[in-house]
């Protein structure tokens, strides 16, 4: 690479980041003089950068004059972990989309509502036309039915009290007894209950205290081949379950 094509770097930003790195290596704190010595920066420059970093919350100054990592860094760390988790989950969804040639959905049941957090589709695998909000169509979608299966009967009853099931297509199931009492299978399928011409399959994602599901949608004409979808869908749901278990949290977009 010739000099003219090298990126323009801002030296003060590089110095500030180096200070953050060194402070992070000293859990008990480190003084400005030691920081200057460790980084090779002039002491006046070190003080100037430290004042700025403290003002912005990236460092904190202790009573004895030592500097420690500030709350802003903790926030960045949490955000980075959440973004990495979302990236890992999305990669799994992309692989599943390519494997099954179907649109992929990740959804949760949170605070009494169905929330679709992620959709991975493409021009050749378009998402279902959400002509009715998924929050009001849990009874008619594999996504919603799988999530509701993770609730108690009382919670399902409460859901349908707030969102009475309505006929969305001639194939929509609206009977409360069946929707509330009938146990859902481990893998849920809806056949044109939400949208004519479209079928959907959903598998539970295992995470404590939060119903989550991974689902696919595809043209109903492919129903005859759905048994080929079962193993990849379950495997992807298990991979996401393991990612969430390691992270210890769900990457909510709220």
Where are these regions (language model features)?
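A structural signal for short hydrophobic beta-strand segments in well-ordered beta-sheet cores
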Residues: 59-60, 106-107, 205
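Amphipathic alpha-helical effector-binding/dimerization core
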Residues: 68-161
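Extended hydrophobic
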Residues: 168-243
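Short amphipathic alpha-helical signal-transduction/dimerization elements
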Residues: 24, 148, 152, 234-245
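N-terminal helix-turn-helix
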Residues: 1-83, 241-242, 246
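Signal-transducing coiled-coil/dimerization helices and immediately adjacent hinge/linker segments
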Residues: 249-254
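Short, structured helix-loop boundary elements
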Residues: 9-13, 70, 82, 86, ...
């Amino acid at each position: 690479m010739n000099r003219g094509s090298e990126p323009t770097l801002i030296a003060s930003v590089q110095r500030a980041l180096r200070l953050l790195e060194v402070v992070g290596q000293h859990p008990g704190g480190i003084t400005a003089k030691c920081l200057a010595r460790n980084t090779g920066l002039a002491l006046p420059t070190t003080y100037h950068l430290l004042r700025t970093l403290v003002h912005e919350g990236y460092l904190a100054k202790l009573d004895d004059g030592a500097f420690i990592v500030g709350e802003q860094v903790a926030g960045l760390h949490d955000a980075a972990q959440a973004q990495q988790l979302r990236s890992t989950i999305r990669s799994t969804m992309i692989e599943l989309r390519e494997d099954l040639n179907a649109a992929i959905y990740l959804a949760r049941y949170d605070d009494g509502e169905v929330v679709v957090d992620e959709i991975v589709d493409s021009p050749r695998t378009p998402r279902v036309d959400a002509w009715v909000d998924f929050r009001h169509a849990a009874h008619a979608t594999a996504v919603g039915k799988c999530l509701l299966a993770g609730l108690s009967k009382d919670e399902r009853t409460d859901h349908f009290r707030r969102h009475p099931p309505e006929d969305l297509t001639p194939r929509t199931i609206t009977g409360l007894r069946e929707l509330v009492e009938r146990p859902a299978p481990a893998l849920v399928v809806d056949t044109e209950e939400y949208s004519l011409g479209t079928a959907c399959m959903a598998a539970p994602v295992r995470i404590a205290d939060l119903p989550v599901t991974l689902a696919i949608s595809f043209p109903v004409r492919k129903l005859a081949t759905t048994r080929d979808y079962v193993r990849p869908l379950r495997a992807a749901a298990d991979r996401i379950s393991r990612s969430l278990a390691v992270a210890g949290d769900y990457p909510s977009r709220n």
